[in-house]
Curated annotation (Swiss-Prot):
GO terms for cellular component: extracellular region; host cell cytoplasm; host cell nucleus. The RxLR-dEER motif acts to carry the protein into the host cell cytoplasm through binding to cell surface phosphatidylinositol-3-phosphate. This is Secreted RxLR effector protein 158. Secreted effector that partially suppresses the host cell death induced by cell death-inducing proteins. Keywords: Host cytoplasm, Host nucleus, Secreted, Signal, Virulence. Residues 1-22 form the signal peptide. A motif (RxLR-dEER) lies at residues 50-71.
Length: 105
C-alpha cells in the first residue's frame, strides 16, 4: 500500500513539473482598463496605494493630492466587530444540537 502512495506522489510531482515547464512567463501581462494590476510584482504596491488617507494637517482642507496623503494601517474596528447574538437564538441552536433537549447556559 505504501508503494502505491509513493507512485501517486511521483506522478503528481511529475505532472506538476510538466505543467510548470509549459507555463511561459515571458508573455506580457495585460492590465485591465478598470485600474487593477495584473502583475504579481505590483500587487503589494497597488494595495498600499488603495489604503492612502488624507493628511491630518488642518491647512489641507480641500487640497487633496498624492503628496498630501499618508499611508496608515486600517483600524481594527473596521474589520473586527463583536457580533451580539440574542439568547433565544443560542438556546434554539443548543436545543437543535442536543436533539430537542432544553439546555440552559
Amino acid at each position: 500500500m505504501r508503494g502505491a502512495h509513493y507512485v501517486a506522489i511521483v506522478l503528481l510531482v511529475a505532472a506538476g513539473g510538466q505543467t510548470a515547464a509549459g507555463f511561459d512567463q515571458d508573455e506580457p501581462q495585460h492590465a485591465p482598463d478598470n485600474g487593477y494590476m495584473a502583475s504579481v510584482d505590483l500587487r503589494n504596491e497597488f494595495l498600499q496605494s488603495r489604503a492612502l488617507q488624507a493628511s491630518r494637517n488642518p491647512k489641507d482642507d480641500l487640497m487633496f493630492s498624492a503628496g498630501d496623503e499618508e499611508r496608515t494601517p486600517l483600524a481594527r474596528s473596521n474589520y473586527l466587530k463583536k457580533v451580539t447574538i440574542p439568547d433565544s437564538i443560542i438556546n434554539t441552536a443548543n436545543a437543535m444540537r442536543m436533539e430537542g433537549k432544553q439546555v440552559r447556559l
